[in-house]
């Protein structure tokens, strides 16, 4: 029997880095992993779908206190921040109440959102839930992704497509998508669409090209983002250029 591995996990430590970046003694690791899961779940439930592409968690220690820094990558800055940062501050209060620790949230804007698998998958799932015809949705998503400059894309949808009595599988692929080439920068995401006919599964696989030796995904992808920060003593916004090269899998 053929065994399929997750393309994101298969490349960890080779061309991809972890989304949780911290170290601790072995006894605390299970507790901290569970805490990270709670934080990610709370953030995903706090905002609508097709909003956040990745959540990065970093743990820092200052004297005896632990400080958590969370980086949110999004294509919709206005929704994340809200009027006068109300949404952002509300999220900070919820997380601090949940884990009883101080946190800081940094927001990075993703410009080329059609290149990110999780955002493409969530957008397809939302349209399917709104009863859009699945073939038109797939065709539109692939055309937009290819125009953004990717090397290849594959989309797989399974379930009762179009309300059919029998579940089936439909896939569309364009370009090159080498899943077994470890140097290939493959972005993979899975999302569910809850319709009146049942649950549809949506898988999106995007190829950004090959990562050369001694290089990382940051050198391959051209998804730039800007950081929006409000200083305490200065009301002006500060923009910091940064490459967004990581994605999350749901």
From Swiss-Prot:
Gene3D superfamilies registered for this protein in UniProt: 3.30.300.20, Ribosomal protein S3, C-terminal domain
- What's a BP term from Gene Ontology annotated to this protein? translation
Its domain of life reads Bacteria
Alphabetical list of Pfam families matching this protein: Ribosomal_S3_C
Q: How does this polypeptide assemble, per the annotation?
A: Part of the 30S ribosomal subunit. Forms a tight complex with proteins S10 and S14.
Family note: Belongs to the universal ribosomal protein uS3 family.
- The name on file for this protein is Small ribosomal subunit protein uS3
What is the originating organism of this protein? Answer: Elm witches'-broom phytoplasma
User: Lineage of this protein's species?
Assistant: Bacteria, Bacillati, Mycoplasmatota, Mollicutes, Acholeplasmatales
Q: Give the gene that encodes this protein.
A: rpsC
């Amino acid at each position: 029997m053929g065994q399929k591995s997750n393309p994101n996990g298969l490349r960890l430590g080779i061309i991809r880095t972890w989304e949780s970046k911290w170290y601790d003694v072995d006894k605390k690791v299970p507790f901290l992993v569970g805490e990270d899961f709670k934080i990610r779940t709370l953030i995903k439930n706090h905002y609508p779908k097709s909003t956040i592409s990745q959540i990065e968690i970093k743990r820092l220690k200052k004297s005896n206190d632990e400080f958590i820094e969370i980086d949110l990558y999004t294509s919709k800055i206005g929704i994340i921040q809200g009027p006068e940062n109300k949404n952002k501050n509300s999220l900070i209060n919820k997380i601090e109440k949940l884990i009883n620790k101080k946190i800081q949230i940094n927001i990075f804007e993703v410009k080329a959102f059609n290149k990110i698998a999780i955002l493409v998958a969530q957008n397809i799932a939302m349209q399917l839930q709104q009863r859009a015809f699945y073939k038109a949705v797939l065709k539109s998503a692939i055309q937009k992704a290819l125009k953004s400059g990717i090397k290849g894309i594959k989309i797989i949808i399974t379930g009762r497509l179009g309300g059919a009595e029998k579940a089936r599988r439909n896939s569309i692929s364009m370009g090159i998508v080498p899943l077994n080439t470890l140097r290939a920068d493959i972005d993979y995401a899975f999302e569910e669409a809850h319709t009146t006919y049942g649950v549809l599964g949506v898988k999106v696989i995007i190829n950004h090209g090959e990562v050369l030796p001694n290089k990382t995904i940051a050198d391959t992808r051209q998804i730039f983002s800007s950081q929006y920060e409000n200083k305490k003593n200065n009301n002006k916004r500060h923009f910091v250029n940064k490459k967004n090269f990581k994605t999350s899998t749901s």
